[in-house]
């Protein structure tokens, strides 16, 4: 099938496949409609007005195979969305921090200002609900100010919003993250407006033994607008520092925003059901409210979300470990590959590489693999890392690496930019990198290429000819002006200048609750390229690594 063809979808009614006898009845009707459409001028035929979406189609097939029972709660494909850019700034839906390309001193942080302003404006437009999720600690500094200023504007406009704020808490590390304290802090900052704002504030850990908690970063307002990506609301990492983390969110409106709300309802349903267990959930509320597990559903009712544009989007998340064991409706039976170098002495059960049930409740993992697999010419990956902290986690996702190896072997160009390994913490995950050297990525790709091709020479040709790999820089200088290495926190995959993922899900093994959007729009992908991928490579190519055994290349 060529890239400009869209495969036919199986006929459905209310989300279910049609029975054969019902399908048989539709055949004469469909033939008649086909005849009519064929007779129409091309300008009025439906297909002429609907651009092909080969990437989303491939991903949707994977999702229906892996997690059919989670459609509408953890993943959903929608049309009629709009990338939420302000007038006069068509690429303004892309929210980068700090946005000071080319300046190691990062004096003008235009991207950060745009992000905080967008957060405030979205919240200020609320009439009913505001839904926020992040990794602990709670939003502070300028991020908290954006939330408070937006809520004050809502109340000043005569509304009484319901607000949920959910953070994922790592055991022990986040013992000082106390929802009741944050609730009280918000009430104090809201002042007189606090009486009109109903709060649910919670921290949650779904599995201590499998290291699972919320990692999604969402701001959903009235189920109509959403901001999501990799940015945590932490002032010390993003705002009040001379070496801010480079990160990206995206903003949209339309049915995909409602999809994000449904995902948050799924997380809050678990949170509310476990609110009496302090080993799992700490909850604080205001104004006598109870826990609100279905706030988004209650707001939306049975009315479908209104379309606001023409952009097709797949919203896709994951449930990590501890919320749901498996999707009982899934007939998914993968052939799970193995690799001896994914284990590091004593480790945890390998959910990423060796657990079919985990796959069925974490559809985002196969969605990202399918996005990469759908590439025909090139793949751009911008991530904190591709390898995890091993132990306790497995070193890498075998199927993701195998998919990348398959692309390299097929002549597809692959560019990977990751956070400078100099950001590695004392135990790997203590900083914004988990590797000591870029060789850990290129050596793994070579190993998987040899396993795929069975030939060292073929593997070398594919690796040397088609891979670009670099550590992140945002200016010509090797470090920030204060001498600190550049930290990258993107969770971004783009293919063929046509489709891309922006969200909170890393490509390395991590069993968290995550969420993101996969967008297929050549126009938006070109904006992403111009505003982020091109400047990123302009500076990062100076830190490009040549894989072992490959001839040195000129940067470019």
Swiss-Prot record:
Task: Kindly state one GO CC term assigned in the UniProt record.
Answer: extracellular region
PROSITE patterns per the UniProt record, alphabetical = PLD (PS50035)
Q: Where in the cell is it found?
A: Secreted
* EC number annotated for this UniProt entry: 3.1.4.4
MF (Gene Ontology): phosphatidyltransferase activity; phospholipase D activity
Q: How is its activity regulated?
A: Inhibited by mercaptoethanol and dithiothreitol.
Name the InterPro entries for this protein: PLD-like_dom, PLipase_D/transphosphatidylase
Q: Where is the signal peptide?
A: 1-47
Give a single Pfam family match. PLDc_2
Domain PLD phosphodiesterase as annotated: residue spans: 210-237, 484-511
PTM info:
Probably has at least 1 disulfide bond.
Q: Name one GO biological process term.
A: cardiolipin biosynthetic process
Query: What is the pH-activity profile?
Result: Optimum pH is 5.5 in both directions.
Q: Which family does it belong to?
A: Belongs to the phospholipase D family.
- Known function: A reversible phospholipase active on phosphatidylcholine (PC) and phosphatidylethanolamine. Lysophosphatidylcholine and egg sphingomyelin are hydrolyzed about 50 times and 100 times more slowly than PC, respectively. During the transphosphatidylation reaction straight-chain hydroxy compounds, such as triethyleneglycol and triethyleneglycol monomethyl ether, were phosphatidylated in good yield, as were monosaccharides. Disaccharides and sugar alcohol reacted slowly, while N-acetyl-D-galactosamine, D-galactosamine and D-galacturonic acid were not phosphatidylated.
What is the name attached to this protein's record? Phospholipase D
Organism expressing this protein natively: Streptomyces antibioticus
